[in-house]
Amino acid sequence: MAGSSRRAGGRRLQLPLLCLLLQGATAILFAVFVRYNHETDAALWHWGNHSNPDNEFYFRYPSFQDVHTMIFVGFGFLMAFLQRYGFSSVGFTFLLAAFALQWSTLVQGFLHTFHGGHIHIGVESMINADFCAGAVLISFGAILGKTGPAQLLLMALLEVVLFGLNEFVLLSLLGVKDAGGSMTIHTFGAYFGLVLSRVLYRPQLEKSKHRQSSVYHSDLFAMIGTIFLWIFWPSFNSAPTPLGDGQHRTALNTYYSLTASTLSTFALSALVGRDGRLDMVHVQNAALAGGVVVGTSAEMMLTPFGALAAGFLAGTVSTLGFKFFTPILESKFKIQDTCGVHNLHGMPGVLGALLGVLVAGLATHDSYGEGLESVFPLIAEGQRSSTSQALHQLFGLFVTLIFASVGGGLGGLLLRLPFLDSPPDSQCYEDQIYWEVPEEHADLAQGSLRPEEPDTQA
């Protein structure tokens, strides 16, 4: 009972104090450093005698709306498949993303838009912050149900910094192309989360295994998340690309890649399923792999056929990963990947990076014409050959894996600090620990909750 009281006291204090501390610090930094850019500042915009329809808002905000919906609705409901963790899946997604948006605005601002002593923000800053939040939520998926909200906020605090540094190295220093984030978002977020999960490994998690499954209605909620993500993914990949043919091509390639990954998912799920039955886990996740795999190459001249082939391959690999590789990750590598982020984001992200290497290596002036300057400016300017660009793309993948692995290890050590509240092994994947729940849920939960025991992270 004493241990239970101490845990309850920690929950009562840790989250409020950390939220207030982080929000207060962020607000001070915003007051000191953050300013509107020339397209959002009233004086600067009108001083330039610009026409309002020329403002970037009108071109970027529709894409931002789609990306924003993906982050808060798509990711949140996709992770709501656990039978007793729906409040936490959607609610902690809301909390993490809200903090990550503010913190990443500062981190990315210092790295990309800092001049004259200030960070200058506009609609593009909002899109980039959403991308960073997406990486954080991917990592959250790997440890879903096994951590407390205070731990998750500290994870986001560290991960946003490392995401920003990795993105800066790849895009600004190495000149890597990765508009849809196969490397910077999906690969980074997945392997950060997987290494984090390994450091937080719980040998006695079997005590909560009965809750690590879905019920009929929770799978339907997760499918809502899938549909939102699937519909808006072309906007996600095309949001940061140059306006015009580049953005058009990116949306088109993503669109067809998603259709192919969906068909391959249904085909493989029935093929490997018991009695030829479809598995909702496969459909919820692997059907989205087509959006991940073309994240790097969608703005390139991938060709419609290439988009279909990439999507079909990604859906196949992802489905087989859920069926065969996820159990091996836990039994052999001690990685407890709750949402299967390795199958949806990790492997398709790496495949997407390698596809980018291939397509970049094939880039020529004949195939791109004057458009080469917007897609591969260093090749167009004669500073690089296509082969050199391809090698830089490959090196960018290795850099991302290093950042993710080291960052995940550091994050795991941070989250293992003994004073941080986390659910005991017997109470993982349970909303009632952190939320007021309806009485019928509480009655069901009480029957399965066991007395609190010490954590067994090894």
Curated annotation (Swiss-Prot):
It holds the Pfam family Ammonium_transp. GO terms for biological process: ammonium transmembrane transport; transepithelial ammonium transport. Residues 35-61, 108-124, 171-178, 241-251, 304, 368-393 are extracellular. One of its GO terms (molecular function) is ammonium channel activity. Keywords: Ammonia transport, Cell membrane, Glycoprotein, Membrane, Transmembrane, Transmembrane helix, Transport. GO terms for cellular component: basolateral plasma membrane; spectrin-associated cytoskeleton. Residues 416-424 are annotated as: Interaction with ANK3. Its main location: membrane. InterPro entries: Ammonium/urea_transptr, NH4_transpt_AmtB-like_dom, RhesusRHD. It is found in: Cell membrane; Basolateral cell membrane. It is a multi-pass membrane protein. It catalyses: NH4(+)(in) = NH4(+)(out); methylamine(out) = methylamine(in); CO2(out) = CO2(in). It comes from the Eukaryota. The chain crosses the membrane at residues 14-34, 62-82, 87-107, 125-145, 150-170, 179-201, 220-240, 252-272, 283-303, 305-325, 347-367, 394-414. A motif (Basolateral sorting signal) lies at residues 429-432. Glycans are attached at residue 49. N-glycosylated. SUPFAM superfamilies: Ammonium transporter (SSF111352). Ammonium transporter involved in the maintenance of acid-base homeostasis. Transports ammonium and its related derivative methylammonium across the basolateral plasma membrane of epithelial cells likely contributing to renal transepithelial ammonia transport and ammonia metabolism. May transport either NH4(+) or NH3 ammonia species predominantly mediating an electrogenic NH4(+) transport. May act as a CO2 channel providing for renal acid secretion. Interacts (via C-terminus) with ANK2 and ANK3; required for targeting to the basolateral membrane. This is Ammonium transporter Rh type B.
